Amino acid sequence: MSWLTAEEALRALKTKPQTLYANVSRGRIRAKPDPADPRRSLYQAADVQRLAERHAGRRKTETVAAEAIRWGDPVLSSAISTIIGGRLFYRGKDAAGFAEVAMLEQTAALLWNGAEQLSCSAGAGHASPSLQAAFLALAGRVTSDLPSLGRSQAALRREASGVLHTVADALAPGSSDRPLHLRLAASWQRPDAADCLRRALVLLADHELNASAFAARVTASAGAALSAVVLSGLATLTGPLHGAAWQGVDALIDTASALGAEQAIRRTLAQGNRLSAFGHPLYPDGDVRALALLSQFHLPPQFAEVREVGEEMVGEKVNVDFALAAMCAAFDLPREAPIIIFSLARSVGWLAHAMEQIDSGELIRPRARYTGPAPETDNRE
């Protein structure tokens, strides 16, 4: 595998340094520190060549848009979060560093761009964390909440706080005078998990323009209520290729428990199934969120074996879906705990994206390329 210096990559691409860095952050060009000078980076030659060849030909706008919306290329502007050089940033702050000390409430204040730190909810909550309760509570608000269109950012931030409290009362029930991570720990009767829950909530609060964030922005762009925005994001998150990827991790662990890690991974790959536990296109050198979380607890033996064997066989490091499932297993949390944690955390990000999209004043309305039967012609004389 050959590598290029920044100067060589820029000459090949005929572009600016900012564009090179953006391509790295989107996972389109792999980069690594220069062994001769760790302050500099080297760029994967094959990735650079592929992009250079792509840009050499003039492509139709519709082709560019179709490729962008599938994966990888920026399709809209956002100041909320980004991934650059294998690091996740929240409004310019390193998310892993921020997670060392911050709570989800402080993360909301940061991502919502000027909001005061959220106070604790006064809701009564439910007996235990429930995703179904969150769906029902949000749906109940949608028909009565005001549309977001035509309202100030200050008014929207106040409503966002209320919507988050609605979600929290369903997903993190309990005493209302405590931070959300403590409420979760108490509802599951696992006080020793509190700090890891805090870190996970912060690390999962936003992740640039992922599938659920895009769904949330589309909903917000139509002027829908913020509760509708979170409802659409939550529905998207439940997909197995997004927030429910932990189920694939659990299935792999179950198979590994019966067959051993190597055979479990071989069987999964032989069946043509993706391994939810490994790799992320935006983190060619490893998911920084996983690294930040895995350093805080001891991996259960089966997870440790799958990690060791899988990273060698697959050639990819474990991702945040693996880390979240492992954390929940390490603290003996309920089986649905990963999606509960993910949903509560990401609600903060969806609301941030909603307010940013509303502020732009733009309706997201792409066109479809028709591939159906030829339209009928009018043969009348």
Write out the residue ranges for each language-model feature.
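Hydrophobic alpha-helical bundle cores within soluble ligand-binding/oligomerization subdomains
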Residues: 2-381
